[in-house]
Regions:
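Non-catalytic cap/lid and distal C-terminal segments of serine-dependent acyl enzymes
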Residues: 1-250
Length: 250
């Protein structure tokens, strides 16, 4: 790994801002997390619970900033008028990670919250060989409701509500080619997003796709109070299954 000063810092990758966390003692297997942020762009740098877990497990974290892109393969004008968030992650973030940290799939785990939670699942479903390990906290899966409610950015990205629905993470699940390790959780008092997590669980179960989920633990609804509550379980899931992937291919 190229020497980086430990702690949080900001970099520019592919012309866009990106937050990095470097632990004092990185793990010996080049495990690394990519964190996908939510719609309000709140940084993990401000969340001591997550930072402590990353430090404890020796996990570098790369956290790209893509505005309200929903981590899709659609042009989001407030992010970039030429490149989608999906292409940015695949074409710029992954090569940057390999160059700077000598880490590459399947040693890269995805962690996301809210908009980024559905983004983590979306990437894992679309590219299960690249991202076999993903954890989503409060994933905003059925985000077509944002179109219905007049979200201007989503309306700039999609022609109608049905087009959004067809692009949701649930519709990207392949019954024969899925990520080997996925975890998602949602507070049952999260009135806006709990139903879409329940529908996702039902679809995965009906297809026989292995998954872990927690739709029972409650504590704060939708936001960082709940995200912090689920941080330890989510990071532990990622670390344990990155290790399983390493053992599987050695």
């Amino acid at each position: 790994m190229i020497h980086h000063q430990y702690g949080w810092k900001q970099e520019v990758v592919g012309g866009h801002g990106c937050d990095l966390f470097v632990p004092r003692k990185p793990n010996p297997h080049q495990y690394l997390l990519v964190y996908l942020h939510g719609i309000h762009l709140k940084k993990l740098e401000d969340q001591t619970k997550f930072t402590a877990l990353f430090e404890q497990n020796g996990l570098p974290v790369v956290a790209p900033v893509t505005q309200g892109s929903w981590w899709t393969d659609r042009i989001c004008p407030e992010f970039d008028r030429v490149m989608t968030a999906e292409r940015y992650l695949l074409d710029h973030i992954l090569p940057y990670i390999e160059q700077e940290f000598q880490s590459s799939p399947p040693r890269i785990g995805l962690l996301g919250t809210s908009m980024g939670g559905q983004g983590a699942l979306r990437f894992a479903y679309k590219y299960p060989d690249l991202f076999p390990v993903a954890a989503a906290i409060s994933p905003a899966v059925d985000y077509q409701i944002r179109y219905r409610n007049g979200d201007p950015m989503i309306r700039a990205m999609y022609p109608n509500e049905e087009a959004v629905r067809q692009d949701t993470a649930t519709l990207h699940i392949h019954p024969l080619n899925w990520p080997r390790h996925q975890f998602f959780c949602c507070d049952p008092t999260d009135e806006i997003w709990i139903e879409s997590s329940e529908r996702l669980r039902m679809k995965l179960s009906s297809l026989g796709v292995p998954h872990e989920c927690d739709l029972e633990t409650t504590g704060g609804g939708h936001g960082f109070q709940y995200y912090n509550l689920m941080a330890e379980q989510s990071v532990r899931f990622l670390v344990e299954n990155l290790e399983r992937e390493r053992m599987r291919i050695t």
